[in-house]
Amino acid sequence: MSRKIVEFRNVSFRYDEEGPWVLKNCSFEIYEDEWLAIIGHNGSGKSTIAKLLNGLLFPQEGEIYIDGIKVDENSIWDIRKEVGMVFQNPDNQFVGATVQDDVAFGMENRGIPREIMKKRIDETLQAVRMQDYLLTEPHRLSGGQKQRVAIASVLAISPKILILDEATAMLDPVGRKEIMQTVNSIQDSQGLSLITITHDLKEITRADRVIVLNNGERWDEATPSQLFKRKDALREIGLDVPFVAHLSDAFRNNGITIEHSPLSHEQLLEELWTYHSKM
């Protein structure tokens, strides 16, 4: 098994002393090179986890470790070298006058030599398919393009962990598709631990593992295919599986054998082709 890169140990958090607990005794691990999805309805605590992982917040109870380092006020800058984040609003993340300047910004703050910076700018923009927009100003980019630049800016500082906190929530369908294609490509090629935080179950189909939060507690953990079989239980906590899972059930209910649990329309077509070839 791969090495643990993140440990949440009995973590509880609330935003003020008299307020409700946003997270309650939450424990989980994340491993090197793993894609973990964290899902839940609005207010379930998932975005709070993202902020705790990056040292933007600290737990009132429990402990968090990133690559063996305890997250606290003394380690915050070491932690942020290891953890990169992309948030919901692409307009709030652009700090440079051009795409090139934005990707360079984090590296400049770390004193990375200019030749290395230039190489990383080229590599990361190619990784997110934005190499043709090097000198483009941010207002000329779509929301999806801005988010891809935000991902490149994080990759340029070479984190061990990349967190996408509802990174597609403010995008149109085209932008969402662009980002998920980018995420799939990065996970295949970059060799880092990826954490995607979302309420949209269509975005978790490629994840290795899924943690489900409900009212601040860890409600379930499963692979995507296992989770999609629990449609009724998910619906009770305000979540719904992708249309392809409902479609698969409809075929089964009409006597068509679907042996596996398809996670995409392409996989469903393969199942139907297999069924047809056996007739």
From Swiss-Prot:
Keyword entries, A-Z: ATP-binding, Cell membrane, Membrane, Nucleotide-binding, Translocase, Transport
CDD domains tied to this protein: ABC_cobalt_CbiO_domain1 (cd03225)
A Pfam family the protein falls into: ABC_tran
Major enzyme class: translocase
Matching InterPro entries: AAA+_ATPase, ABC_transporter-like_ATP-bd, ABC_transporter-like_CS, ABC_transpr_CbiO/EcfA_su, ECF_ABC_transporter_ATP-bd, EcfA_1, P-loop_NTPase
SUPFAM superfamilies: P-loop containing nucleoside triphosphate hydrolases
SMART domains to which the protein is assigned, alphabetical: AAA
Ligand binding (ATP): 40-47
Membrane topology: Peripheral membrane protein
Localization (cell): Cell membrane
Primary location recorded for the protein, binned into one broad class: membrane
Any GO CC annotation of this UniProt entry: ATP-binding cassette (ABC) transporter complex
Listed GO MF terms: ATP binding; ATP hydrolysis activity; ATPase-coupled transmembrane transporter activity
Domain ABC transporter: 6-240
Domain of life of the source: Bacteria
Record EC number: 7.-.-.-
Family: Belongs to the ABC transporter superfamily. Energy-coupling factor EcfA family.
Biological role: ATP-binding (A) component of a common energy-coupling factor (ECF) ABC-transporter complex. Unlike classic ABC transporters this ECF transporter provides the energy necessary to transport a number of different substrates.
Assembly, per entry: Forms a stable energy-coupling factor (ECF) transporter complex composed of 2 membrane-embedded substrate-binding proteins (S component), 2 ATP-binding proteins (A component) and 2 transmembrane proteins (T component).
Protein name: Energy-coupling factor transporter ATP-binding protein EcfA1
Gene for this chain: ecfA1
